[in-house]
């Protein structure tokens, strides 16, 4: 009888200490869907998991259906009161009315939110942005990729409600104009990352607003914006901490503009795909100044030759891991073997398919 009691006590100790410790470790590595499933296994496991607030800091509804209703249901639960990340990317069934209900029914639920992804939630408009951002005072990262309903009014609401944004993705928001860039520039001097890919209504003047005020930028994505000119590109030189720059499709940039970009000597990733006016002179300037480059795409630039690669090999051979010279008809030494002779650390030779 005594032995049986000892065994039961050992089992209880094992359950309370060992299993609890294991669950604490394992739970931090499980997808949210698995965590929710584990809640249903037993009351003890439910209580154990609920007692770990650090595993309930994210609500991930990516690609889910009925996402608006799911979001409301999640935010009504006490375990999500300290949520910091919400991912609604490609989610279906989330509209302005859901975000307005979050504001009215769960006004304190997002006080700790720092990261909000609304990518491709195309039924959300300026009104939805106003509702959700009005209760997210600590928001730092906001992404609303490919939403054509968002206008300058939505960005006005964002900058009014969220004063601490450091990472902003507006890629594909084609209705935005220079006014949005003015609002961003005036409100976010500490902005570190900005993506305005395919925001085709933004002109040199709008970009200049950002470049002349957001000096902390480390990542700048200007992909598929062919309307900018050297007038704006030259001011990129003001971004002393810039690490990533994508100007794919910048048909108006010249070697002079590239020369100013080369002053950003901390650059690690530079996409010059289809920058068709660039010649060896521009690439040589980059090579001589940006000696930490790890990624460089010259795809489709017919004005560059083997000479620029020779210069690059003298300054960036120990850093470059990705180099795309496909479509550069002036470069003759572009086989895999020849490129590896000049850049032995290359692991990727093709960025564009």
From Swiss-Prot:
Highest taxon in the source lineage: Eukaryota
PANTHER family (UniProt xref): PARTNER OF PAIRED, ISOFORM B-RELATED (PTHR13318)
A Pfam family assignment: LRR_6
Protein name: F-box protein At3g58530
Domain F-box: 8-56
Source organism (scientific name): Arabidopsis thaliana (Mouse-ear cress)
């Amino acid at each position: 009888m005594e032995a049986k009691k000892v065994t039961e006590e050992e089992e209880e100790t094992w359950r309370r200490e060992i299993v609890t410790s294991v669950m604490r470790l394992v739970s931090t590595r499980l997808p949210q869907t698995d965590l929710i499933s584990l809640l249903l296994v037993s009351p003890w496991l439910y209580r154990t998991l609920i007692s770990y607030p650090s595993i309930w800091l994210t609500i991930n509804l990516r690609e889910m259906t009925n996402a608006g209703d799911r979001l409301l249901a999640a935010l009504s639960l006490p375990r999500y009161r300290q949520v910091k990340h919400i991912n609604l990317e490609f989610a279906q069934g989330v509209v302005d009315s859901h975000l307005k209900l979050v504001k009215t029914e769960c006004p304190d639920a997002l006080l700790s939110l720092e990261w909000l992804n609304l990518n491709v939630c195309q039924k959300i408009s300026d009104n939805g942005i106003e509702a959700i951002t009005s209760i997210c005072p600590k928001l730092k990262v906001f992404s609303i990729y490919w939403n054509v309903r968002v206008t300058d009014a939505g960005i006005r609401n964002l900058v009014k409600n969220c004063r601490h944004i450091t990472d902003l993705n507006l890629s594909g928001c084609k209705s935005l104009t220079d006014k949005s860039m003015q609002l961003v520039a005036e409100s976010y001097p500490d902005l570190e990352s900005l993506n305005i890919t395919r925001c085709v209504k933004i002109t040199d003047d709008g970009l200049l607003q950002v470049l002349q005020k957001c000096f902390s930028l480390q990542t700048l994505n200007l992909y598929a914006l062919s309307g900018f000119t050297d007038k704006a590109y030259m001011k990129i030189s003001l971004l002393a901490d810039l690490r990533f720059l994508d100007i794919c499709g910048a048909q108006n940039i010249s070697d002079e503009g590239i020369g100013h970009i080369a002053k950003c000597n901390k650059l690690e990733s530079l996409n010059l795909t289809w920058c068709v006016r660039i010649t060896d002179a521009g690439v040589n300037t980059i090579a001589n100044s940006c000696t930490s480059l790890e990624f460089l795409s010259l795809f489709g630039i017919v004005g560059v030759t083997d000479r620029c690669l020779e210069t690059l090999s003298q300054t960036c051979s120990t850093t470059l891991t990705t180099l795309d010279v496909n479509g550069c008809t002036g470069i003759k030494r572009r086989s895999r073997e020849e490129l590896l002779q000049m850049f032995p650390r290359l692991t990727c030779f093709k960025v564009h398919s």
